[in-house]
């Protein structure tokens, strides 16, 4: 697989701030290392796991944000949008209802859904953009 286009930290930070403005929540970074780790997760998977499929990279791009809680608030929203942006940058769109997204992201943040299960869900919800 050719190297994907990655979501930059500044984009994730802008998305996070936008979500807080739109939906409310506590601002601020809770854990710098958790954010750095979350942002590097997909790239590390691509670099060191030659069998990684694109949905697994998408899952990795949001998993660390939703699960590691680098921000004081808005981690699930930011994690989901990081996945959607990453997919979009690479020619894919996420096709899921709001209810499906909420269920998946709540399950992910609560530890009821692991990264591979998220990737499996994404496999059936990613479509090539037109």
Locate each region found by the language model.
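FIC/Doc superfamily catalytic core
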Residues: 1-130
């Amino acid at each position: 697989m050719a190297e994907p286009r990655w979501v930059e930290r500044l984009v994730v930070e802008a998305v996070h701030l936008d979500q807080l403005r739109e939906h409310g929540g506590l601002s601020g970074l809770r854990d710098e290392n958790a954010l750095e780790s979350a942002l590097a997760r997909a790239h590390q998977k691509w670099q060191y796991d030659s069998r990684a499929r694109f949905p697994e990279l998408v899952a990795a791009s949001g998993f660390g944000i939703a699960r590691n809680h680098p921000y004081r608030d808005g981690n699930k929203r930011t994690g989901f949008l990081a996945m959607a942006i990453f997919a979009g940058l690479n020619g894919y769109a996420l096709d899921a209802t709001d209810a499906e997204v909420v269920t998946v992201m709540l399950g992910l943040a609560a530890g009821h859904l692991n990264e591979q299960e998220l990737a499996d869900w994404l496999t059936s919800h990613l479509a090539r953009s037109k």
